């Protein structure tokens, strides 16, 4: 019987997982998706403002990973509404490995 390969326990170590790079890649994808919209809900307008800061945060400000992980529900909802399978896959991997 074939058993699926076990996924490593993400809580053992975050070493060698490029969480910051994955978050920046997803953030860029989100920005492109949102900027293509004719009108944006106030939530996404504020999100884009925070995203600009999150790319180069100062001490005490949220970085890209924190911004994405703290808004994962809304991001998944956006990708589902847009039928963006690539975005959903990136978000799923980031959430599983890093959030």
From Swiss-Prot:
InterPro entries: CowN (IPR024899)
UniProt keywords, alphabetically: Nitrogen fixation
Top-level division of the source organism's lineage: Bacteria
GO biological process assignments: nitrogen fixation
Xref: Pfam families: CowN (PF20543)
Function noted in UniProt: Is required to sustain N(2)-dependent growth in the presence of low levels of carbon monoxide (CO). Probably acts by protecting the N(2) fixation ability of the nitrogenase complex, which is inactivated in the presence of CO.
Similarity annotation: Belongs to the CowN family.
Protein name: N(2)-fixation sustaining protein CowN
Taxonomic lineage from the root: Bacteria, Pseudomonadati, Pseudomonadota, Alphaproteobacteria, Magnetococcales
């Amino acid at each position: 019987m074939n058993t699926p390969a076990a996924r490593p326990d993400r809580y053992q170590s975050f070493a060698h997982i490029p969480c910051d790079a994955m978050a920046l890649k997803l953030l860029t994808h989100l920005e492109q998706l949102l900027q293509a919209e004719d009108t944006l809900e106030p939530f996404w307008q504020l999100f884009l403002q925070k995203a600009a800061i999150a790319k180069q945060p100062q001490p005490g400000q949220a970085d890209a990973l924190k911004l994405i992980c703290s808004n994962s529900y809304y991001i998944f909802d956006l990708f589902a509404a847009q039928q963006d399978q690539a975005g959903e896959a990136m978000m799923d991997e980031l959430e599983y490995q890093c959030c």
